[in-house]
Curated annotation (Swiss-Prot):
This is Small ribosomal subunit protein uS7. Signal peptide: none annotated. GO terms for biological process: translation. It comes from Marinobacter nauticus (strain ATCC 700491 / DSM 11845 / VT8) (Marinobacter aquaeolei). Belongs to the universal ribosomal protein uS7 family. Part of the 30S ribosomal subunit. Contacts proteins S9 and S11. The keyword Ribosomal protein applies. One of the primary rRNA binding proteins, it binds directly to 16S rRNA where it nucleates assembly of the head domain of the 30S subunit. Is located at the subunit interface close to the decoding center, probably blocks exit of the E-site tRNA. The keyword RNA-binding applies. InterPro entries: Ribosomal_uS7, Ribosomal_uS7_bac/org-type, Ribosomal_uS7_dom, Ribosomal_uS7_dom_sf. Keywords: Ribonucleoprotein, Ribosomal protein, RNA-binding, rRNA-binding, tRNA-binding.
């Protein structure tokens, strides 16, 4: 814990095309080596593909995909008397968002399509439909928390 002031949260500037702060944050997650224009091209390209394949608003599909990936509970390791227990804890909203974005990018990169925009679009469409690797990751995390429910009395 810091002894001085806690650093103020910096406000994220919404993205220029859709005016969404959440999408701007996601673009930052996609970005590698500070190449923001490349990341923007990838994300906007993916959203164009999403709009093409599904006849819905791409930003709504993106939001729906993130909602389906966000974990409600996760496990944290806690040492008690020489034994390490996986203790289920609720995930705060900002971390839910961060994990969902991280998993969406991670599992998009592992897909087989040619371009990153196509991979990302595929993962967004799958996640919006409650399928795909990112949603499976969320289910695995929830299953882990459910299996370790007995240790939930070891609070943090």
């Amino acid at each position: 814990m810091p002894r001085r002031r806690v650093a103020a949260k910096r406000e994220i500037i919404p993205d220029p095309k859709f005016g969404s702060a959440r999408l701007a944050k996601f673009i930052n997650h996609v970005m590698e080596s500070g190449k923001k224009s490349v990341a923007e091209r990838i994300v906007y390209g993916a959203l164009d593909i999403v709009a093409e394949k599904s006849k819905e608003e791409p930003i709504e599909m993106f939001e729906k995909a993130l909602e389906n990936i966000q974990p409600m509970v996760e496990v944290k390791s806690r040492r008690v008397g020489g034994a390490t227990y996986q203790v289920p804890v609720e995930v705060r909203p900002s971390r839910q968002n961060a994990l969902a974005m991280r998993w969406l990018v991670e599992y998009s990169r592992k897909r087989g399509e040619k371009s990153m925009a196509q991979r990302l679009a595929g993962e967004i469409l799958d996640a919006a439909d409650s399928k795909g690797a990112a949603v499976k990751k969320r289910e695995d995390v929830h299953r882990m928390a459910e299996a370790n429910k007995a240790f939930s009395h070891f609070r943090f």
